[in-house]
Amino acid sequence: MTNDALIAALSHLVSEGRNPDTMDIDLLSSQEIVERLNQQDKQVPLAVEAVLPQIAQAVDKITAAFKQGGRLIYLGAGTSGRLGVLDASECPPTFGVSDQMVIGLIAGGKEAMFTAQEGAEDNATLGAHDLQQIDFSSKDVLVGIAASGRTPYVIGALEYANDLGATTIALSCNPDSPIAEIAQIAISPVVGPEALTGSTRLKSGTAQKLVLNMLTTASMIRLGKSYQNLMVDVRATNRKLIARAVRIVMQATDCQREEAEALLKESHNNAKLAILMHLTGMNYEQATAKLSQSDGFLRRAMEEHEE
């Protein structure tokens, strides 16, 4: 694409428009600037609310893929790619899953997390190449993330995933974007022009973060990774998470700290098993077997025990 064509294409994007509410932002005090930014940020949850049906549809597809041994792959460039890597990296400690279950890919590789890799996002073949490097298959789900909705790296990856017969989801902040047309499910929270023209790390990035949070959190809940609103599959790998596991057991069972710590020790730091053991009187082996029979759903395991 020529520079003239690119300039023309960008001029039609909502995310690249000039925001009439911030035209004088360079004249404001620090207090006034942050108030103006905050006013803009308030628009983001409403934009996400408008696409909740599409987000729920994506959650159903992701959950189904997980149950069949598939993975969730986030792929993007720049801020979009970094947000995908961030959400993916939080899943193992939060939900006790493998670090291969949710994977984030960014144009330019690991170095791009810290330093912009010029030109990487413009390479359409690189997206497909990065998917091939992780043995992407039809069992997996690809979420292509691009605020503009037109990043070649993401377009190439979505087209490759479609050719394999995988589920494809597009996350963009512009309506009727190229990636929305390619993907099977289009999630397009339109947040409007940015406070700083074209700086899509602002409202667009915030909207993307909210959507990604929903995709993994809702999918993991659907897999039984929570009991009530407690993270019962938390992986206690540091002092804070160990303390959190103790609190989770206490909150779920109304037991005292000493008993919660003893239960966690007996269950090998597995909060879900500790809770099941306390509430049903099962020993470790019995609780492990019952939880396996209930596909990891703690509530279901307790209900089946009561029958």
Swiss-Prot record:
Residues 62-225 form the SIS domain. NCBIfam families: N-acetylmuramic acid 6-phosphate etherase, PRK05441.1, PRK12570.1. GO terms for molecular function: carbohydrate derivative binding; carbon-oxygen lyase activity; ether hydrolase activity. Belongs to the GCKR-like family. MurNAc-6-P etherase subfamily. PANTHER family: GLUCOKINASE REGULATORY PROTEIN, N-ACETYLMURAMIC ACID 6-PHOSPHATE ETHERASE. Its EC number is 4.2.1.126. SUPFAM superfamilies: SIS domain. Homodimer. The gene is murQ2. It catalyses: N-acetyl-D-muramate 6-phosphate + H2O = N-acetyl-D-glucosamine 6-phosphate + (R)-lactate. The keyword Amino-acid biosynthesis does not apply. HAMAP family: MurQ. Keywords: Carbohydrate metabolism, Lyase. One of its GO terms (biological process) is amino sugar catabolic process. Pathway: Amino-sugar metabolism; 1,6-anhydro-N-acetylmuramate degradation; Amino-sugar metabolism; N-acetylmuramate degradation; Cell wall biogenesis; peptidoglycan recycling. Signal peptide: none annotated. The active site is at 90 (proton donor), 121. It is an enzyme of class 4 (lyase). This is N-acetylmuramic acid 6-phosphate etherase 2. Specifically catalyzes the cleavage of the D-lactyl ether substituent of MurNAc 6-phosphate, producing GlcNAc 6-phosphate and D-lactate. Together with AnmK, is also required for the utilization of anhydro-N-acetylmuramic acid (anhMurNAc) either imported from the medium or derived from its own cell wall murein, and thus plays a role in cell wall recycling. A lyase-type mechanism (elimination/hydration) is suggested for the cleavage of the lactyl ether bond of MurNAc 6-phosphate, with the formation of an alpha,beta-unsaturated aldehyde intermediate with (E)-stereochemistry, followed by the syn addition of water to give product. Coiled coil: none annotated.
